[in-house]
């Protein structure tokens, strides 16, 4: 959510930020609506002040025996009172319209975010690991993983496309991945493990910006609750409508949850395999910080995600997203892309973003500095640490063997109960 005061103070900078997002200038339109709202508010305040003044004058006129003046004042008070509901309704309507207009606009990119319209404008910052040299042609996971227990056909019979039914050691491996990630993020990166609701209300989905823009990407229950598309929704909203103590910051939270996405805008993309599912597991990393700490926190968070890939010995590259490719709420984003030999390509496995105070304004999440006056909005950050299903895919493709089996990465062996390799199910 944008601060209208910043738009008033520097409309040109606001329009420049929108332009970097590929949007037309809107400051003039927004400021005109803001001026209309303030005029309505001034009119209401003036009417209330005059009503109070006239009410006092009635008593004075009565005391002076001036009945005509008293009656005229009574009529004026009655007229002011009668007109007030319409004025207040006009104010509410204008306030709602301005709120909705601002809520529909994305966050503005940070100064160090590169310009660009789409993923072609993203900047590769670094690479880690050397892709494995195979002595056979590596396959995409969709071509060999079903024999190992990644069953798409059974899932399709009961749920349709973009679902999977995992069996035996394959299911154990996915569970091991989630537990391994949680252990790393809590023990080594200092995140507090949380178990969150999987269903949230409208105001929570609005706070983390899934609503209203991404309504079509969510699943909604018949009683109006929304299935979370990421536990960012529930973790970040843990501080909504709160005033935190400065000493309590930063807050770092993590959760391993199933996530649910309709993938309404992904028709025809990744229709094979386990890359893009309606239901998937993910470890989310959320941070709540002071404004001056959020840039460093983004680096720390991204490093925590990178450490998982390195522990699993999965080659990856780090990308700085351009302004046109960032998510709606982000002011700066790093993507981590893991190497998939079966696709001969790097694919996104984690996205780590600094949202500044954009979500905090929507949630009214603030903090008070020690010895300070007034409250400030916190900064919120989120990132995947990691997407479990995509990490499973990366292991399947990078650790596949010529006979169709898959070796278990050394880091996961303590979680696998003695299983060292996935082999075709009998």
Swiss-Prot record:
It catalyses: tRNA(Ser) + L-serine + ATP = L-seryl-tRNA(Ser) + AMP + diphosphate + H(+); tRNA(Sec) + L-serine + ATP = L-seryl-tRNA(Sec) + AMP + diphosphate + H(+). One of its GO terms (molecular function) is ATP binding. Its main location: cytoplasm. One of its GO terms (cellular component) is cytoplasm. Pathway: Aminoacyl-tRNA biosynthesis; selenocysteinyl-tRNA(Sec) biosynthesis; L-seryl-tRNA(Sec) from L-serine and tRNA(Sec): step 1/1. Keywords: Aminoacyl-tRNA synthetase, ATP-binding, Cytoplasm, Ligase, Nucleotide-binding, Protein biosynthesis. It is found in: Cytoplasm. Pfam families: Seryl_tRNA_N, tRNA-synt_2b. Its EC number is 6.1.1.11. GO terms for biological process: selenocysteine biosynthetic process; seryl-tRNA aminoacylation. It is an enzyme of class 6 (ligase). CDD domains: SerRS_core. L-serine binds at residues 230-232, 284, 384. It comes from the Bacteria. Belongs to the class-II aminoacyl-tRNA synthetase family. Type-1 seryl-tRNA synthetase subfamily. Homodimer. The tRNA molecule binds across the dimer. Consists of two distinct domains, a catalytic core and a N-terminal extension that is involved in tRNA binding. This is Serine--tRNA ligase. The lineage of its organism: Bacteria, Pseudomonadati, Pseudomonadota, Alphaproteobacteria, Sphingomonadales.
